[in-house]
């Protein structure tokens, strides 16, 4: 199982769908070479350099954590079941309530939609937060399958620099 990177007093907790097969195999988040997660964080000014997936644990040094709504690795999020999300939601809310980051950043609209049940979601900070005292921010997935440019992704993630 891919380890979470969690701690108390996090500025931002990045929450993905679930580990991809490659991430699970190598033991690091966002490990697919086409994934732009670490490049986006760097370009948005959230890290001072582009970290590698092997350095994912170092995000804790910046006050950032990593987890997923579902722990089970799959080829893609479309392989997840309703039961995966039901159980994942319970576990994720428990983690959030224990660690209480300032912001939950959902890496993909679908992650927030599955957690919240809210269908109409825009990028950025949300009017309704899932855990009192923790702001919810929805950002695009950084997967190489997402057609947004690095510049477009960066502009959205840059809003998190407030934290």
Regions found by a protein language model. Name each.
Residues 18-20, 47, 110-111, 143:
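Catalytic metal-binding/acid-base residues of hydrolase active sites
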Residues 11-17:
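Short, hydrophobic/glycine-enriched beta-strand segments
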Residues 19-22, 72-74, 142-145:
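A short, flexible beta-alpha/helix-coil linker loop
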Residues 3-11, 33, 40, 76-92, ...:
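C-terminal capping/extension of enzyme domains
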Residues 15, 106-107, 139:
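Short hydrophobic segments within beta-strands
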Residues 23-83:
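Short, surface-exposed acidic-centric catalytic microdomains
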Residues 61, 65-115:
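Internal catalytic-core helix/loop-beta-alpha segment
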Residues 1-6, 50-59, 94-95:
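Short amphipathic alpha-helices and their capping/turn segments at secondary-structure boundaries
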């Amino acid at each position: 199982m891919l380890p979470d990177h969690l701690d108390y007093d996090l500025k931002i907790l990045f929450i993905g769908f679930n580990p991809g097969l490659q991430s699970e195999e190598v033991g690091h988040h966002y490990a697919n070479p086409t994934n732009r997660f670490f490049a986006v964080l760097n370009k948005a000014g959230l890290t001072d350099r582009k970290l590698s997936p092997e350095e994912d644990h170092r995000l804790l040094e910046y006050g950032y954590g990593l987890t997923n709504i579902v722990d089970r690795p799959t080829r893609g999020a479309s392989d997840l079941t309703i039961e995966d999300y039901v159980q994942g939601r319970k576990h994720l809310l428990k983690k959030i309530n224990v660690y209480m980051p300032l912001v939950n950043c959902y890496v993909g609209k679908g992650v927030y939609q599955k957690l919240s049940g809210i269908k109409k979601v825009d990028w950025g900070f949300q009017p309704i937060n899932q855990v009192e005292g923790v702001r919810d921010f929805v950002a695009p997935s950084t997967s190489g399958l997402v057609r947004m440019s690095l510049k477009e992704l960066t502009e959205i993630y840059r809003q998190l620099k407030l934290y």
